[in-house]
Amino acid sequence: MVKLFCSIVGVAGSPFSVEVNEGKTVDDLKKAIKAENLDDPTLRNVAPKNLQLFLAKKGDAWLRYNEDLDTYLQSEIDTSSYLHMRASWKLSKPTLFGPDVSLGEDVVHVLVVVPGQRLPIAATAIHEPHPARKKRWEELNKILDRNQRAKVNAAGESSTGYSYVSFSDVDRVMRARRYEQPRKVIENEKIDVLYEYLLLLTKAFGEIVNGKEAKRLYFIVPVLVCVCGLFDGEVRILAEETVTGKRVHGDGAFEFVIERGSKRVCIVKAKRDDFQQGLAQAYVGSEVLADLEGLTDLFSIVTNFKEWYFSRCLNDRVERDDATMDMEHDIPTREAVKKIAEKIYSMLS
């Protein structure tokens, strides 16, 4: 069991503790918070799923539980400076309350935002998108609602799967401008290790481009892992991640989501080399993630290993770059591997 101290944003004198098994999820923590506060009018009529939780930590420092806490809770707290805790995350996640994380003393671990609570403007800013992005969501929702093949969850909320939305529809709302994704230099020794492993995979699996589509993922993953390993444990790769929007009436599915702090890189494998559908999937999913986590800048990659499309979904625009993994006799060149890896490294830096 782990004991966590929580505070409600906007409410003075609100710190309280909850005990929950570290093997549980953030969703379970929401239920424990509600159960601990059945007599509290602030939480009495709120469904646990509607609570928004933020890790009360900046760098290695927890929020101090001292005489200044009440004043801080009622000030204009910018929750975007804290990590938004997604419901599906395990509490044992290294970036949350994993075994190597010190919980400290006289600190607050979780900030709770209650829907409908009168909060200072900055505390609610994460929930109100930029005007340009809000307009994009409204236009996107018209398409999603029109093409709706509803998936209904236990709360009776429905969303539209990305597979029911065409690229041409999404492109009308999220037309991408050209940009050049920068590169950040990776040491030759690291590239050599990655390249040697890819050569080993080529010997084991045979043809990449003309071979079976399913095996391409085995070539994509080492590139991602190599780059993520450069950050000394600061980066996590979430596999087969699915998200469902609240204000965006769609859902997204990614082969991987790479996380580093507030940065997100969403990875989509282009199925049957259909890059347009892959881009539609990535763009809808990115907006859903922006909706859920209050993010303003998201990266996505759509690839079949040979072709790579890099995109940025910003508040006021969408940008896209593309690059080719050059091949010689169906074997990637070292320079091409270096180019792709360094673009991804720059995204996460």
UniProtKB/Swiss-Prot annotation:
Q: Which organism is it from?
A: Phytophthora infestans (Potato late blight agent)
User: Would you tell me the protein name for this molecule?
Assistant: Crinkler effector protein 5
Q: What does this protein do?
A: Secreted effector that elicits necrosis in host plants, a characteristic of plant innate immunity.
- Which first-to-last residue range defines the signal peptide? 1-17
Q: Where is this motif: HVLVXXP motif?
A: 109-115
The domain-related comment in the record is: The CRN proteins have modular architectures that include a signal peptide, a conserved N-terminus, and highly diverse C-terminal domains. The conserved CRN N-terminus harbors a distinct LXLFLAK motif, which is followed by the conserved DWL domain. A highly conserved HVLVXXP motif marks the end of the CRN N-terminal domains and forms a junction where diverse C-terminal domains are fused. The conserved CRN N-terminus mediates the translocation into the plant host cells.
Q: What is the similarity comment for this entry?
A: Belongs to the Crinkler effector family.
Q: Which Gene Ontology CC terms are recorded?
A: extracellular region; host cell nucleus
Q: Where in the cell is it found?
A: Secreted; Host nucleus
Entry keyword Aminoacyl-tRNA synthetase:
no
Keywords, alphabetical: Host nucleus, Secreted, Signal, Virulence
Q: Report the Pfam families cross-referenced here.
A: Crinkler
Give the superkingdom in one word: Eukaryota
Region span, LQLFLAK domain: 18-57
Q: Tell me the gene name.
A: CRN5
Annotated region DWL domain: where? 58-108
